[in-house]
Amino acid sequence: MRLRFLLLLILLSNTLSSAQTAKFDMLDWMTMDPFGSHMSGTGTPMWTVMDAPHGKFYWVKSPKGYPWDVKSFDSNFIYDTITEVSWSDPQTFKRHIGPNGKGYPISPRFVPYVPGAAPTKLWTITIPSSSTNFEIHSSCSQYRMSNLGYAKTEIWGPFYESLGGDLPPNTETLHLNWLWSCDSSYNNCKVKERFTLMRAYGSVKWENYKLSSGQYVLQQASLRNVASLGVTSAVHPCWN
């Protein structure tokens, strides 16, 4: 009887533990659902363009199809792959190399969390300076190399925020922090970008901070809380 009781307790404990753990598919948080709209607001608008056959999606910042941030994804990670250099020439861009050539791993594809728990740091990825090289392209083929130094990403949440506009009040969000020019212990990072992510809407807020006297000081922000009609295609003459 005692053995049966202990086995029952173990089974119940495993069941409760399994029930308390879930995973976010970060692709759902970083892309807008395809219902013929894009996000606009007080700053730069954003169109999400999916290219699933090539394992990419684009955060397009203009109806003409560029500039853009290009993210790659697979079953393990989402990578920061390409960003613009010039807002007027899609043949200029920065290509992030990363540890495997796909770019900087900014998030696991699936992030575990405990439903109902208080907001917390869910994940951290550290990237050594040897893996933050990038190409600055002045044309499709001509480029020079540079480096971000030590870098890291953090995923925090889930939060419940009311960001106004067309976004539902008290809606679950995640914060993706991207920090670079850190010291070798991944502290004192000189720059921090924060992306506020909301399922079905994608990146709804962007903030840029710089480290000053040990504190992060906001330099620039962009809120995208209005769902506006209209789609676009990504224009990228230098790759398929």
Task: Please provide the spans of the model-predicted regions.
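Sec/Tat signal peptide C-region and signal peptidase I cleavage site
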Residues: 15-19
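Conserved functional acidic sites
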Residues: 20-240
